[in-house]
Design a protein with these regions (language model features):
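Surface-exposed loop/turn and secondary-structure junction residues enriched for glycine/proline
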Residues: 4, 9, 20, 47, ...
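C-terminal charged capping/lid subdomain of soluble metabolic enzymes
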Residues: 39, 124-202
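Active-site segments that bind and position negatively charged phosphate/pyrophosphate groups
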Residues: 48-149
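Carboxylate- and glycine-rich phosphate/diphosphate-binding segment that chelates Mg2+/Mn2+
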Residues: 2-80
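Short helix-capping/linker segments at secondary-structure and domain boundaries
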Residues: 25-35, 92-97, 115-125, 163, ...
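Structural motif
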Residues: 10-16, 98-101, 161
Length: 202
């Protein structure tokens, strides 16, 4: 059961974490589903019934497919962005309590999508589509200033806290999020670029 009136009547800020989760979930589905989803963002934001029902159905179907995947690597697809989320939260320390949960998760997804471009050839156009979709939902980039060395150390710490392997669930294509090894050089390069871009927002 899903009471759509609760969605329509909710404070827009309260819905943003759900929007971010939708983006990550549909990204794990398929190219055609992703295209359908991104095209209906305005209708979802407007609270149109068909768009909301479709979004919920697409999300539930995608989540079911991940959980029932025969490939063990694919079962981690719903964790896309969460290592970056936990890393940013830990590095921000007490300041993280002032940052909405949806922004922490969206930043994790933005960063890991860029890692995926180098680590598993995720098309750069799709990286930008993830950015655009989050922006369309009103979720802007977060401004902060962190030291790259501390971020890298925490990122690896968060990885190994849940696995003995240095692998991340990253999209190789729309609908194909798999565990992928990320070399130190790739991580370092992207961390430096990512943190520099966020510092410029201050």
């Amino acid at each position: 059961m899903c009471d759509l009136d609760l969605v329509r009547e909710a404070d827009p800020e309260d819905l943003k974490l759900g929007y971010v989760v939708l983006v990550g979930t549909v990204l794990s589905s398929s190219k055609s589903r992703w295209n359908q989803f991104t095209e209906t963002v305005p209708e979802i934001l407007a609270g149109e019934e068909v768009a909301l029902v479709n979004a919920v159905q697409w999300s539930q179907t995608a989540r079911k497919d991940v959980l029932m995947a025969t490939n063990p690597s694919a079962r981690h697809a719903l964790d896309f962005g969460k290592t970056g989320e936990r890393t940013l939260s830990a590095c921000l320390g007490d300041a993280a309590s002032q940052v909405p949960a949806y922004q922490l998760l969206s930043e994790g997804m933005r960063f890991e999508a860029r890692l995926a471009h180098d680590a598993c050839d995720f098309d750069i156009d799709y990286v930008f589509e993830v950015d655009d979709c989050l922006e369309d939902f009103g979720i802007e980039e977060l401004a902060f200033d962190l030291e790259p060395a501390a971020y890298i150390e925490e990122f690896r710490k968060q990885q190994f806290a849940r696995s003995n392997r240095s692998m991340l669930p990253l999209p190789a294509a729309l609908g194909a999020i798999r565990l992928t090894s990320v070399e130190d050089e790739v991580l370092e390069r992207h961390v430096h670029a990512y943190l520099a871009s966020r510092k410029e927002l201050l």
